[in-house]
């Protein structure tokens, strides 16, 4: 089927080499202000032909709004988005129309529909994911405005190149913003010299080996990890890097979406070598949903993990998903794996909503959190205090310069010209009746660790939802292989056309959008049963405490 959701339904349509692709969102709330520029920015993060690391199919992926809005405000009627296909070269596929491509759905598609796929991968192409990015980027603006919920995905590994273990743990506790993911994941490539330059200006050779520190590298930057290890530079490293990387001159800007500069350089080197050889590679992407309301998820067959798994596994090339400790948890004892409960005490003045996790609230009692919500830990890949402050990055990846890399809230909303809070008077979602605190005498419990990945018994705990997706190597490779045609005859095949060597750099906005769709539907299902009084969240409690 092409529809996901129970109350909030998203339907996608169109084929990879058809005239257009699109989606319909049904069941979305009325009177929600949507900034179409934010949707377009997420589409831009996903689109092909971004750099030498991605497919050279030149699709601008410009969003076309067909229905569901009065200017920028939803009507409560079906929302329809359309994206034209503009770079279709069908002749690239004519030479192997009778040969099912290994790793693709050509054979199974034929057996199911009795139709040979003459061009591209039709409905089974990764091209379809542009439609869910449009839908999810719309839905997540509502999630952020009403629940302060933010979602970020980044590349954890490509092949055997992965984030350092401590850096990965720190990111799962304090998620980086999308701005930071794109800033630290950007690498300048000087093809003539065969050198790479990372976020901090450090220079590496074609194999990703450190050569020298750059003039713009902040004090404390070391080739060991490619990141600053001490001090608080007076200059803004994010703004400086943006200025350097936005005007590469004779260099090419590569985007990995791996928020660790040294790892990003190694990924670039590896992918370019594989692309030259005509091969492909997969990897792992990590997604973190922050400030998800407590208590959403439906037993037994529609648990939060099950629903997330369903939509994430529907993304082409995704072959697996794990939550929290995942498969590593099988090596742990129950005494180590169990997440113990504690109470949440939100300080009157302290970390802002973004960059503040449940374990941070507990750790603040022991003085382990700095005033800006950052956590100084050895091996972290960035200064969290600086990177999560507003105004530190104009916008490399998505959301306007509120500095969070997430949809704006309140008077910062770009569609709100008056500076007043967005309209929340919709009778179907009455925020004035919403109880943001537990009943008298009860405490909002949180877990001091997060091996469960923010979900227990299929229901959200309020901790960060953390999951990782396993991505297989791209099936279309330019290495000749012996296979069989539809008639059982041996033949040789070398796939031509416009394909990615590795889809990981384009994957984060797809996973972010898919996660938004699931959370949005689950929230509406909970509200339909119990109302907003049963939707406490850490973000709302933080606001009510300060107010």
From Swiss-Prot:
A GO CC term assigned to this protein in UniProt: cytosol
GO biological process, one term: aromatic amino acid family biosynthetic process
Location of this chain's protein in the cell: Cytoplasm, Cytosol
UniProt EC number: 1.5.1.38, 4.2.3.5
Broad class of where this protein is predominantly found: cytoplasm
Protein name, UniProt field: Chorismate synthase
One function term, GO molecular function aspect: chorismate synthase activity
UniProt catalytic activity: 5-O-(1-carboxyvinyl)-3-phosphoshikimate = chorismate + phosphate; FMNH2 + NADP(+) = FMN + NADPH + 2 H(+)
Biological role: Bifunctional chorismate synthase and flavin reductase. Catalyzes the conversion of 5-enolpyruvylshikimate 3-phosphate (EPSP) to form chorismate. Acts also as a flavin reductase (FR) able to generate reduced flavin mononucleotide in the presence of NADPH.
Catalytic residues in the record: 17, 104, 500
HAMAP family cross-referenced by the UniProt entry: Chorismate_synth
Keywords for the protein's UniProt record, in alphabetical order: Amino-acid biosynthesis, Aromatic amino acid biosynthesis, Cytoplasm, Lyase, Oxidoreductase
Pathway noted in the entry: Metabolic intermediate biosynthesis; chorismate biosynthesis; chorismate from D-erythrose 4-phosphate and phosphoenolpyruvate: step 7/7
Organism: Plasmodium vivax (strain Salvador I)
Homology family: Belongs to the chorismate synthase family.
């Amino acid at each position: 089927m092409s529809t996901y959701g129970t109350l909030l339904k998203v339907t996608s349509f169109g084929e990879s080499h058809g005239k257009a692709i699109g989606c319909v969102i049904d069941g979305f709330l009325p009177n929600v202000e949507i900034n179409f520029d934010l949707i377009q920015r997420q589409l831009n993060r996903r689109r092909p032909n971004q750099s030498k690391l991605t497919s050279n199919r030149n699709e601008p992926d410009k969003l076309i709004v067909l229905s569901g809005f009065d200017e920028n405000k939803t009507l409560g009627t079906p929302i329809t988005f359309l994206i034209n296909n503009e770079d279709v070269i069908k002749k690239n596929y004519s030479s192997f129309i009778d040969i099912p491509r290994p790793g693709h759905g050509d054979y199974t598609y034929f057996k199911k529909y009795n139709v040979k796929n003459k061009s591209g991968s039709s409905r089974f192409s990764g091209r379809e994911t542009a439609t869910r990015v449009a839908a999810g980027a719309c839905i997540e603006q509502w999630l952020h405005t009403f629940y302060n919920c933010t979602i970020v995905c980044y590349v954890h590994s490509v092949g055997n190149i992965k984030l350092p273990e401590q850096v990965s743990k720190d990111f799962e506790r304090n998620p980086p913003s999308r701005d930071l993911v794109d800033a630290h994941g950007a690498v300048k490539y000087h093809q003539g010299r065969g050198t790479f330059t990372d976020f901090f200006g450090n220079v590496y050779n074609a194999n990703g080996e450190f050569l020298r520190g750059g003039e713009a590298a902040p004090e404390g930057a070391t080739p060991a990890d490619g990141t600053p290890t001490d001090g608080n530079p007076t200059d803004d490293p994010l703004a400086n890097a943006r200025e350097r990387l936005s005007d590469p001159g004779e260099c090419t800007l590569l985007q990995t979406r791996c928020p660790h500069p040294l790892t990003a350089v190694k990924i670039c080197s590896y992918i370019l070598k594989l692309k030259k050889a005509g091969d492909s590679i997969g990897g792992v992407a990590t997604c973190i949903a922050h400030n998800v309301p407590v208590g959403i998820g439906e037993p037994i067959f529609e648990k939060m993990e099950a629903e997330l798994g369903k939509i994430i596994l529907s993304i082409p090339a995704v072959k697996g998903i794990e939550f929290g400790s995942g498969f590593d948890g099988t090596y742990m004892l129950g005494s180590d794996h169990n997440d113990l409960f504690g109470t949440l005490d939100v300080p009157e003045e302290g970390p802002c909503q973004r960059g503040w996790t449940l374990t941070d609230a507990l750790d603040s009692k022991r003085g382990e959190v700095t005033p800006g919500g950052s956590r100084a830990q050895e091996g972290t890949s960035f200064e969290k205090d600086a990177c999560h402050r507003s105004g530190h990055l104009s916008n490399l990846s998505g959301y306007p310069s509120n500095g969070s890399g997430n949809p704006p809230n309140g008077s910062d909303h770009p569609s709100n010209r008056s500076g007043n809070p967005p309209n929340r008077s919709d009778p179907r979602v009455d925020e004035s009746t919403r109880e943001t605190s537990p009943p008298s005498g009860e405490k909002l419990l949180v877990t001091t660790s997060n091996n469960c990945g923010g979900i227990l018994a299929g229901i959200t705990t309020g901790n960060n939802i953390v999951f990782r997706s396993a991505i297989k190597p791209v099936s279309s490779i330019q290495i000749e292989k012996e296979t069989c045609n539809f008639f059982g005859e041996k033949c040789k095949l070398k796939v031509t056309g416009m394909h990615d060597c590795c889809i990981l750099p384009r994957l984060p906005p797809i996973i972010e959008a898919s996660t938004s769709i699931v959370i949005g539907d689950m929230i509406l299902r909970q509200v339909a049963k119990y109302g907003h009084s049963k939707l406490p969240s850490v973000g709302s409690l933080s606001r009510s405490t300060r107010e």
